[in-house]
UniProtKB/Swiss-Prot annotation:
UniProt key word Phosphoprotein: yes
Species annotation: Arabidopsis thaliana (Mouse-ear cress)
Gene name in the database record: RPT2
InterPro entries assigned to the protein according to its UniProt record, in alphabetical order: BTB/POZ_dom (IPR000210), NPH3/RPT2-like (IPR043454), NPH3_dom (IPR027356), SKP1/BTB/POZ_sf (IPR011333)
Annotated function: May act as a substrate-specific adapter of an E3 ubiquitin-protein ligase complex (CUL3-RBX1-BTB) which mediates the ubiquitination and subsequent proteasomal degradation of target proteins. Signal transducer of the phototropic response and photo-induced movements. Necessary for root phototropism. Involved in hypocotyl phototropism under high rate but not under low rate light. Regulates stomata opening. Seems to be not involved in chloroplast accumulation and translocation.
UniProt protein name: Root phototropism protein 2
BTB domain boundaries: 32-100
Alphabetized UniProt keyword annotations: Phosphoprotein, Transducer, Ubl conjugation pathway
SMART domains in alphabetical order: BTB (SM00225)
Xref: PROSITE patterns: BTB (PS50097), NPH3 (PS51649)
Expression (tissue specificity): Expressed in hypocotyls, guard cells and mesophyll cells.
Similarity comment text for this entry: Belongs to the NPH3 family.
One Pfam match: NPH3
Complex formation: Interacts with RPT3 and PHOT1.
Length: 593
């Protein structure tokens, strides 16, 4: 009945179903007297057949200024040419099939054309209404299909109440399936909802909330819907599967739709704790960062992740960000806010329970998060845009008391120093400032003592602690258990002095080598002069100057020796170690060779 272009068709070229009908009583030789335009399609029809069923077309013809209306434009009819063809068939008495896919469009078209029972008994609107009630909305699957078909029929489908009826039916039947599943798998209905637009899906979720469905059932539906809708957005945790699109390119419309989708999903999340896996929340946050959603959306996700941060993995925290030219970076600010919110929550919980957060009373959750943070630092340590201040800012978010051992943090620091070999001594000290050398295990201290990348004071801390432990006679098994002696914590001021001594010794060693070379050059010059008397006097003078220089150096080194006469007195350890025998150290010199 429809053709493309502007050439109307004759009645003898109408569909075969029209020719087969037994209700067609007029001769097909009767010429058509009106052309109905629907978009680019033209329908050659008879006025009297259309007016008999459609009050809208009757009004158009009656109210027209032209005495003989030959063309009618119905481009605004819901459903377009395909649905109008079925409405025309109904006017001609031609049989056609009403299905769950087309019933909403047919009902909207019938209301648009005013093909109601008020105008004519047993009209098209009444037929579609009966089909909706008795067939389409009698099952969950049928109601979802009808609701899906309403997406292209807005706003008339909502104005006519079809959307509301479908949402109510879907919400009620989904709640019933969630509580009393009749099919396997039990969550089959969540898969059915995935075909809906996010706005209709939101309406269904709201309907289920009003009916008191369990939050866990809502969470299951939201997770399934999100995974289906955003499966191609972020394919892995690192963001390498993401194709960045500039807001000005051809994909901007799709990007905008995805942004709205993420923001709508986040607004639907129930507030109950523990409903959503942390990796799901982190995946949503990656999408939100990539799509540049609103600050409210990202803050909501960060808040939810911080509540369950003890269950997060390092991969979950690797949140990619992108520059305007598509370069992939890491969103360190989001991670910092998440960790900070978790620590603040733990602090408030500790104070509420009567604990003292500032004196080292940390929960198991906080200790677990500390290990995750250290592993995260080790993972991002090789990134070139990671500065010392950013590294320390993340490391210092976790209280030092939350780390029973600083081995993981030491590993992260070592990776950072290896990835940034051009740091000077002061910068390396800043990197290591977040670590406590006295909380390293025996193996870590052994590695640190031989690590040339570490600053001198860190190496000295490790060596001094081992010496103190050796003097106190503590067994090696206790060393590996990372038992920190209270006496070792009292020697921090002495360690600072040792660091200064070590640096001065290095300067003296350099000065000594210069003087040796100077004396050697003088001897060569005097031997080449040839005058024995002056040569002898020069040698005597040289010997005296050598003797005087080495004497002064030896005296100065003797003053700087931290172990001379047992200056590092550890006798006070006896008071707290319960009678542990500590032998007095032997006299020894501070070697400068």
């Amino acid at each position: 009945m429809a053709t493309e272009g502007k050439n109307p068709i004759n009645m003898n070229s109408m569909s075969s179903s029209l020719a087969r009908t037994g209700q067609w009583v007029f001769s097909q030789d009767i010429p058509t007297d009106v052309v109905v335009e629907v978009g680019e399609a033209n329908f050659s029809l008879h006025k009297f057949m259309l007016v008999a069923k459609s009050n809208y077309i009757r009004k158009l013809i009656m109210e027209s200024k032209d005495s003989d209306v030959t063309r009618i434009n119905l481009s605004d009819i819901p459903g377009g040419p395909e649905i109008f063809e079925k409405a025309a068939k109904f006017c001609y008495g031609v049989n056609f099939e009403i299905t769950v896919q087309n019933v909403a469009a047919l009902h909207c078209a019938a209301e648009f054309l005013q093909m109601t029972d008020k105008y004519c008994d047993n009209n098209l609107a009444g037929r579609t209404q009966d089909f909706l009630s008795q067939v389409a909305l009698s099952s969950l699957s049928g109601a979802i299909v009808v609701l899906k078909s309403c997406e292209i029929l807005l706003p008339i489908s909502r104005d006519l109440g079809i959307v509301r009826r479908c949402v109510d039916v879907v919400g009620a039947k989904a709640c019933n399936e969630a509580m009393f599943p009749c099919r396997t798998p039990p969550n089959w209905w969540t898969e059915e909802l995935c075909i809906l637009d996010v706005d209709f899906f939101s309406d269904v979720v709201s309907s289920m909330k009003q009916r008191g469905v369990k939050p866990s059932s809502l969470a299951s539906a939201i997770i399934t819907y999100t995974e289906k809708s955003l499966r191609d957005l972020v394919r892995d945790h690192s963001g390498r599967g993401v194709k960045y699109s500039d807001p000005g390119d051809n994909e901007s419309d799709e990007r905008s739709q995805q942004r709205d989708l993420v923001q709508s999903i986040v607004s639907l999340l129930p507030s109950d704790k523990g409903l959503f896996p942390v990796n799901f929340l982190c995946s949503l946050l990656r999408c939100a960062v990539f799509l540049d959603t609103s600050l409210t959306c990202k803050n909501e996700l960060e808040k939810r992740i911080s509540v369950v941060l003890e269950h997060v993995s390092v991969d979950d925290l690797l949140i990619p960000s992108f520059t305007y030219d598509g370069e992939r970076l890491l969103d360190l600010d989001s991670v910092r806010r998440i960790i900070s919110a978790f620590v603040e929550k733990e602090k408030n919980v500790g104070v509420f329970n009567g604990g003292d957060f500032n004196r080292g009373v940390c929960s198991v959750s906080l200790q677990r998060v500390a290990k995750t943070v250290d592993s995260y630092l080790a993972e991002i340590a090789t990134y070139g845009d990671l500065t010392i201040s950013k590294f320390n800012a993340i490391a210092n978010l976790v209280p030092k008391s939350a780390r029973k051992s600083d081995d993981d943090l030491y590993r992260a620091i070592d990776i950072f120093l290896k990835a940034h070999p051009n740091l000077d001594e002061i910068e390396r000290e800043k990197v290591c400032s977040s670590m406590d050398p006295l909380k390293l295990s025996y193996d870590a201290r052994l590695h640190a003592s031989q690590n040339k990348r570490l600053p001198v004071n860190i190496v000295l801390h490790a060596l001094y602690y081992d010496q103190l432990k050796l003097r106190s006679g503590v067994a090696e098994q206790e060393e590996r258990a990372v038992v920190v002696l209270p006496e070792a914590l009292k020697t921090r001021s002495q360690l600072q002095a040792d660091t200064t001594l070590a640096k001065e010794n290095e300067a003296l060693r350099s000065e000594l080598m210069k003087m040796k070379m100077y004396v050697s050059d003088m001897q060569k010059n005097k031997n080449g002069a040839g005058a024995s008397s002056s040569n002898s006097s020069s040698l005597v003078s040289s010997k005296k100057s050598k003797h005087t220089f080495f004497s002064s150096v030896s005296k100065k080194l003797g003053k700087l020796n931290p172990f001379k006469n047992g200056s590092k007195d550890t006798s006070h350890i006896d008071e707290d170690l319960g009678g542990v025998d500590i032998t007095k150290p032997r006299r020894r010199r501070f070697s400068i060779s």
